[in-house]
A protein has these predicted regions:
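C-terminal end-of-chain micro-motif
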Residues: 3, 166, 253-254
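Polar/charged alpha-helical tracts
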Residues: 5-6, 65, 132, 243, ...
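Conserved beta-strand-loop-alpha-helix hinge in the C-terminal portion
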Residues: 232-254
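A general boundary/transition motif marking the beginning of the first structured unit of a protein
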Residues: 10-12, 217, 237
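ABC family nucleotide-binding domain
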Residues: 16-222, 228
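Pre-NBD coupling/linker segments of ABC/ABC-like ATPases
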Residues: 2-13
Length: 254
């Protein structure tokens, strides 16, 4: 399928890209017990951009890690599509993350000995999969790093490194992208460029994205914002604006 074909494909019905049922995650024992997730039920729709917000310690990153198979929940179930993550062994989890999920983290996690281009194609290389060169060319051009592909991470700015991470997350056409504070180390211009690209990947290619963020302006790029507090989903907002997100955050704090 070409980029033109893919872009013109009618948007699929918004069935879940991922969902959790009564998800709990507990750390410690006795008086030191911390309930990071306390019975969360949440659905992330396919071909939608969802932001997850909440105060520090509310369970945002823990939720993402459990749903992506990076951490095991104490109880409850998580699904990526119709695949129950809890039923997978370590090898199957690795394969699922490699084949079906893309990750964008605040820390870039680029391999220092590889060039930017080699870092981007790493997921396909590890999977033994031929790189979709048309998709690769599209990604690096859209992200403005097509002239930096032979440079190593230390030769790139923070914004350029994060664009490489974004391209790497999308190179295998994942079912779902999890982004944990992806703009935390970026300046305002790089932040706007990154969020604009994520928004376009949803609008143009039906990509499904879940982004953890503290930034009310960044959350306004999403279709929906889910708010967490004390390990629970406490509110949500559809078609957010920066002002409506900020007002909701202020209300939660009272």
């Amino acid at each position: 399928m070409t980029l033109i074909d893919e872009a013109s494909t009618p948007q699929r019905e918004a069935t879940p890209a991922a969902h959790a049922v009564d998800l709990c995650k507990t750390y410690g024992t006795g008086d030191a017990t911390v309930h990071a997730l306390a019975g969360i039920d949440v659905t992330f729709e396919r071909a939608r951009f969802t932001a997850v917000m909440g105060p520090s310690g509310s369970g945002k990153s823990t939720l993402m890690h459990c749903m992506a198979g990076l951490d095991r929940p104490t109880s409850g179930k998580t699904y990526v599509g119709d695949l129950e993550v809890g039923n997978l062994d370590d090898k199957e989890l690795t394969q699922m993350r490699r084949d079906r999920i893309g990750f964008v983290f605040q820390s870039f996690n680029l391999v220092p000995t590889l060039t930017a281009g080699e870092n981007i194609t790493l997921p396909a290389d590890l999977a033994g999969r031929e790189v979709d060169r048309e998709w690769f060319d599209y990604l690096v051009k859209q992200l403005g790093i097509d002239d930096r592909l032979t440079h190593r991470p230390t030769e790139l700015s923070g914004g350029q490194q994060q664009r490489c991470v974004c391209a790497r997350a999308l190179i295998n056409h994942p079912d779902l992208v999890f982004a944990d504070e992806p703009t935390g180390n970026l300046d305002s211009n790089s932040t706007a460029e990154m969020l604009g690209f994520l928004r376009r990947s949803v609008d143009d290619f039906d990509q499904s994205i879940v982004m953890v963020t503290h930034d009310h302006q960044g959350a306004a790029y999403a279709d929906r914002v889910v708010f967490l507090a004390d390990g629970k989903v406490v509110d949500e907002l559809v078609a957010p604006t920066a002002d409506s997100v900020l007002e909701r955050v202020r209300t939660m704090g009272t």
